[in-house]
Amino acid sequence: MTDFLEVNRQELGLWLREEPGAFDWSVYSQHVCLIEGKGESCQEKERQLRARVKRILPIDVHQPQPLGTGSLAPLPADALVSAFCLEAVSPDLASFQRALDHITTLLRSGGHLLLIGALEESWYLAGEARLAVVPVCEEEVREALARSGYEVRDLRTYVMPAHLRTGVDDVKGIFFAWAQKKVGV
C-alpha cells in the first residue's frame, strides 16, 4: 500500500495497527459487505484487509521511479488502484499525464489499473488551506489513459447531485476507470 502524503501514511498505519484514535472506516467496510452480499461481518472484512497489507510505502507520482530506487515492493504489479491522487497532486493536465505515465511503470504488461478520481474539481479544503486540483473531464481521462498505453475496459462517471455538495470542494462528479496496460508497453 502506498500514499503520497506522510500524514496519510501515518493515519493508515494507525488503522493497520488498530490503534486508538485511528480513523473509523467501518461505515465503508459495512457498505462493501452489503454490496458483496456474502453475509460477512465488516470486522471480518477489515481483518482480511489488514492481513493483506504488508507495508505502507511512500510514493511520489511526479518521479519517474515513483517508489524510489531500491524499493522493496514486488514489481511489476498485476494491478494498481489509484484513488483521488493524480488529479489532487498535479498542478496541470501535463503533470497529470506524467504522473499517470510514472505509475504505469509499476504495472506489468497486461496488468489492470483502477483509476478513481474527481471530475472537474479545481480546489478542495484541507483544514483552513484551499488546495488546487487539476480539473479533468471524462474525455481527458480517456485520452490520458490511451497515451499511457492503456486500453480502457470501462469508464463510468457519477454526477454529484447538488444536495450532496458539502462546500469542501467544487467537485462536479467522480470517475471510475478500469483500464488494462497493453501488452508490450
Where are the model-predicted features located?
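SAM cofactor-binding core of SAM-dependent methyltransferases
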Residues: 1-21
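Short alpha-helix
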Residues: 36-48, 132-149
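S-adenosyl-L-methionine
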Residues: 16-69
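A short glycine-rich, Lys/Arg-flanked "PGG" loop and its adjoining helix->strand segment in the class I
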Residues: 73-74, 94-109
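Core SAM-dependent methyltransferase catalytic element
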Residues: 148-185
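A short acidic, Gly/Pro-enriched loop at the edge of an enzyme's catalytic core
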Residues: 64-80
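Acceptor-substrate binding/catalytic loop of class I
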Residues: 91, 121-142
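Conserved beta-strand signature within the Rossmann-like core of class I S-adenosyl-L-methionine
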Residues: 110-118
